[in-house]
Design a protein with these regions (language model features):
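Conserved active-site segment immediately N-terminal to the catalytic lysine
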Residues: 157-204, 285-289
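Glycine-biased, low-complexity coil/linker segments
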Residues: 231-234
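PLP-dependent aminotransferase-like
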Residues: 69-173, 180
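PLP-dependent aminotransferase class I/II
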Residues: 39-43, 51-52, 127-131, 136, ...
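Short glycine- and hydrophobic/aromatic-rich loop-to-beta-strand nucleating segment
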Residues: 194-195, 204, 209-212, 303-305
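Conserved PLP-binding active-site segment in aminotransferase class I/II-type PLP enzymes
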Residues: 1-70, 74, 143-144, 255
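Short mixed-charge
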Residues: 148-167, 220-226, 236, 241-252
Length: 351
């Protein structure tokens, strides 16, 4: 019997005239780099994921590395990642000079082996990176149980690590935008979560990503650390910073959520203490370079796509669910094991 083969393209982006129009408006607005559309998208993502803050960046890779910089992870530290993941999950650890520790998967499962995770933790372990593969949220209850059990081994090296008080859980949610488990969205479960908006994802800005965090102390005020060797130019008093962030000035009354957002802006804009939008305000053109950091911000053209995708996202997820149900039905009698995207306590993002 002759069968006609049909080409099914791999995850083409779902774009409409709405996205095209929003991008056109962004281009003609005269504001195409990080600006009002990017800030609006950050607010919408925070509301959608129930997180304190969102920082939009150029990739999930940038977001994952940003977490390590915020935590001060570097040489002498260890970061645990699952062996079954994309290269970026592992490569960002190499970028900061920390030691990469890989944990194998469970048998017949895409999640990491949590017993092996517990065995892999040492006094040098600073971060565990669970991966929500295929948009299915990991068993974070088990992950947090393990890091709490190993709390006595934790040795913090900056103020943020000390405030968290245990090994940090930094989720790779590249596939999991819109997924949930036990009533909580990916993004409000782990301490930090990194999302991808790459062209093949079910929510896309062509290239792009986002970093979110969910910390119980986010609204608490940050305590400063005096640096006696440095004096303020005008007051002559000791310059104050935050432990682990040498050279970054302390801001009176700043909360942890505000500090982490400010640090993320610095780390993603060459250490520039004002973004392009802030510099447009009257008399605010002058800025300082605080440190030699990176360039990985999102642009308003990318954010324009994201704003329309956010509006359409419930329909995009519903359509993917229909397609998955058709695959599940077609494969059920063929002895083919498929991922369980839906259950009593979880809903995947079908990424």
């Amino acid at each position: 019997m002759n069968m006609k083969l049909r080409n099914i393209p791999f995850s083409p982006p779902d774009m409409t005239e709405m996205e095209a129009q929003e991008v056109r408006e962004a281009i003609l607005s005269g504001w195409i780099t990080t600006g009002p559309r990017t800030k609006k998208l950050e607010r919408e993502i925070s509301a959608f994921l129930h997180t304190e803050k969102t920082v939009c960046l150029n990739s999930a890779t940038a977001a994952m590395e940003m977490v390590l910089h915020l935590l001060g992870v570097g040489p002498g530290d260890e970061v645990i990642v699952p062996a079954y993941t994309y290269t970026a999950t592992a490569s960002v650890t190499q970028h900061v000079g920390a030691k990469l520790v890989m944990v194998d998967s469970q048998k017949d499962c895409v999640e990491m082996d949590y017993d092996q995770l517990a065995e892999a933790i040492t006094e040098k372990t600073k971060v565990v990176v669970p991966v929500d593969l295929g948009g299915i949220v990991c068993d974070y209850d088990r992950v947090f149980e393990i890091v709490e059990q190993k709390k006595h081994l934790f040795r913090p090296s900056n103020a943020l690590q000390a405030k968290i008080g245990r090994i940090v859980v930094a989720a790779d949610c590249a596939h999991a935008f819109g997924a949930s488990r036990k009533g909580k969205m990916a993004g409000e479960i782990a301490d930090f979560s990194s999302f991808s908006f790459h062209a093949v994802k079910n929510f896309t800005t062509a290239e792009g990503g986002a970093l979110t965090w969910h910390l119980h102390f986010g609204d608490e005020k940050v305590e400063p650390t005096p640096i006696p060797s440095l004096k303020g130019r005008e007051t002559g008093t000791d310059v104050r910073t935050v432990s682990g962030y040498h050279g970054i000035p302390y801001v009176e009354g700043e909360t942890w959520n505000e500090l982490l957002y400010r640090l993320s802006q610095l780390f993603s804009l060459h250490g520039q203490n004002k973004d392009a939008l802030a510099k447009t305000k009257l008399g605010a053109w002058e800025y300082d370079i605080i440190g030699p950091w990176y360039k990985c911000n999102m642009t308003d053209i990318m954010a324009a796509l994201g704003l329309v995708q956010m509006e359409r996202y419930p329909q995009l997820l519903a359509r993917r669910k229909e397609i998955i149900q058709r695959y599940d039905e077609g494969l059920k009698d063929l002895n083919v094991k498929v991922l369980n995207h839906y259950g009593n306590d979880h809903q995947g993002s079908m990424s």
